[in-house]
UniProtKB/Swiss-Prot annotation:
Transmembrane segments: none annotated. Disulfide bonds: none annotated. This is 2-phospho-L-lactate transferase. It catalyses: (2S)-lactyl-2-diphospho-5'-guanosine + 7,8-didemethyl-8-hydroxy-5-deazariboflavin = oxidized coenzyme F420-0 + GMP + H(+). One of its GO terms (molecular function) is LPPG:FO 2-phospho-L-lactate transferase activity. Pathway: Cofactor biosynthesis; coenzyme F420 biosynthesis. Keywords: Magnesium, Transferase. It comes from Halobacterium salinarum (strain ATCC 700922 / JCM 11081 / NRC-1). 7,8-didemethyl-8-hydroxy-5-deazariboflavin binds at residue 49. One of its GO terms (biological process) is F420-0 metabolic process.
């Protein structure tokens, strides 16, 4: 059994080549749900969906978001209709506080009006969110729904969410708080970040399949954003402890102090970690070994395997996955 902690695009890119290194039938992927949004009643789970679509062979690999060649009929008409009604279609309309804790529990603190569809949702992509919302409304847990969707996409790995409870990543800025999707999609990551909150994390329970998969490890933490992709998982009671009991290798999303992509540097600094590979190692005190880029000379107190950590192709991903396997061997002290 091998377990991957997945969020954003870093770990899904790694998974694209990992299937040649780690047996998919013996692989579990635990997906971050802190980025999820309820948009017009639909539950959008970006990090789960990227794994679903990649494993199902339909992912838009240009954006690593949504379904390739998806239609935009509903999104376009909704945008035009909103504009005609004098509604700015690009400005998120976060629902009032009392609405954030009403209705479906899993959507707490992440509810947006569909009057402004600030995130592009394709027609087939929308069907996935519609089915997910419908099954949740029937009383199924997010774990159950995710596994049914994984079956529908014929995934070869077991995909489970980190929790069946709501945890929302909230970014604190000088102008007030924003859901992470407002910060990243609508504001393009421009606002100054003062802190990051994982709202609901102190009350949420980690999904049992996620805990079991981590305990059964070893665990691979891909080059995802340590704050917004992995942080929500660490906020859950039980996951950090399970990681400390497991054998864990982490791939740094930095080359020394240069991040590969995304807002990780800004967010790391905001939560008190140095935006660098050294800062990632401090944040991941549970990790037994690291995979670093060959250009990264950071000296760590744990075993390190170096390789080219770029993930532009499946061959790249396979190379990094093999480095992860080598790092796990190094951490265990086994001789190969």
């Amino acid at each position: 059994m091998t377990t991957f902690l997945a969020g954003g695009t870093g770990t899904p890119k790694l998974l694209a080549g990992a299937r040649r290194v780690f047996d998919p039938a013996e692989t579990t992927v635990v997906g971050n749900t802190g980025d999820d949004v309820a948009l017009g009643g639909l539950l959008v789970c970006p990090d789960l969906d990227t794994v679903l679509f990649e494993g199902g062979g339909v992912l838009d690999r240009e954006t690593w978001w949504g379904i390739a060649d998806d239609g935009s009929t509903t999104h376009d008409y909704l945008t035009d209709l909103a504009a005609a009604a004098d509604i700015d279609p690009d400005t998120p309309r976060y629902l009032p506080d009392d609405a954030q804790t009403a209705g479906r529990d899993i959507a707490r603190w992440r509810r947006f009006s569909a009057a402004s569809e600030f995130m592009f949702i394709g027609d087939r992509d929308r069907a996935v969110h519609t089915l997910r919302a419908g099954l949740l409304d029937e009383g199924h847990t997010l774990t159950e729904v995710t596994r049914r969707l994984a079956d529908a996409f014929d995934l070869s790995v077991d995909l489970v969410p980190m929790s069946n409870d709501p945890v929302a990543t909230i970014v604190q800025t000088p102008d007030g708080e924003q859901h992470f999707q407002t910060f990243w999609v609508a504001e393009h990551g421009d606002p100054t970040v003062e802190d990051v909150e994982f709202r609901g994390g102190e009350r949420a329970t980690a999904a049992q399949p996620a805990i079991e998969a981590i305990r059964d490890g070893p665990v691979v933490v891909g080059p995802s954003n340590p704050v917004t992709s992995i942080g929500p998982m660490l906020a859950l009671d039980g996951i950090a402890d399970a990681l400390r009991d497991a054998q864990v290798v982490a791939v740094s999303p930095f080359v020394e102090d240069e991040v590969f992509s995304g807002p990780a540097a800004k967010l790391m600094a905001a939560v008190g970690h140095d935006p660098s590979t050294a800062g990632v190692a401090d944040a991941y005190d549970f990790a037994d070994a690291f995979v670093l880029d060959t250009a990264d000379s950071t000296d760590l107190d744990r075993p390190v395997v170096r390789t080219d950590t770029s993930l532009d192709t499946e061959a790249d991903a396979e190379r990094v996955a093999r480095a992860c396997r080598d790092a796990l061997v190094a951490a265990s002290g086994e001789v190969t």
